[in-house]
C-alpha cells in the first residue's frame, strides 16, 4: 500500500531503456518516502526473460502479467491491468515513459482513476506543499517538473488530494543505475484473467512496421550540435560533414530548429532530446538554460562561438572563439590528416 509503482514498457522480451531509468528514479523516491518500489511487466512469453533484470534495479515487488493478448501492445488490456491493480494496491505514485505507449496508457489510467497526470516531466522530486487557499499542509508530495509555455518556463506541479500521483517522463533525462544483480525482490505472477475481461481483446494487431530512426542522438558518443549562429541550412551541412568524420551525430538548439535550419528530430534540450555523449561540440550555440538542461551531463564540451561571453562557454571544457565557417573546416582537415 502507498508504494511507488513503475510501468515497464516491454518490446517482445526487451525492457525499454526509459523503464530502467524510471526504476532507478523510483528507487530513490521510494527510499526518500520510506516505502517499497513495485514494478509492472506485461507481455506475451516474458516469464523467465525479464524478471532478474528488472529486479536488479532495486524492485521490491514485481507484478508479471503474461498472456497472448498483451503483446503487441493494445490500449484496453494494459489499461485494465493498471486500473484494477491500482485499485487493489493503492499506490501513491505511478511512473511511466513519455513514449508512444506511455502517452496512450497514462491518460487512460489516470482518467479511469480520476487521479490526474503530468506529462513529459524532465525531473521528479519529493517535497512539501502548503495550499494557501485551504491552509492545508501536505508532506511528501511528488514534485512533477516539466517545461511549459514552449520551454520558456519550468513548471512544478503537485497533486495533493488524488492518488496515485501519475507522471510520464521523457527518455534520457534520468540515468539508469542497477542496485544489485542479485537484488532480492519478490515476483508475483498475476492471473491475467482476474484483471482483464475478454472484451478487452477485441482489438488485435495484425501487422507492425517499425521504421529505423534517422538519428541516434541518445546513444551517440560524439555529438556536433548547431545553434542559430550556424546561420543556414548550408551551415548544418558543414556540421554533418564533421559529424560523419567523427562517426558522431548532428544535434541542434531550438533556435536553429525554429529558424528552419534543420528538422525538429535533432533538437536537444528541455523541449527536445536529452543527451549524454562523451564529446559535445557546440557550434554557434549561445547556451540558453533550456538547451543546457538537455546536454549538461556530457563528458567533454567544446564550444565554437564568435561571442567569448556566450553562456555556453561557462560550462565548456574548451572554448574556441571564431565562426563556424572558419573553425569547422579546420576541424575536418585536421582530423582527416591525423586519424589514419
Give the location of each predicted region.
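N-terminal glycine-rich FAD/FM-binding segment characteristic of electron-transfer flavoproteins
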Residues: 1-340
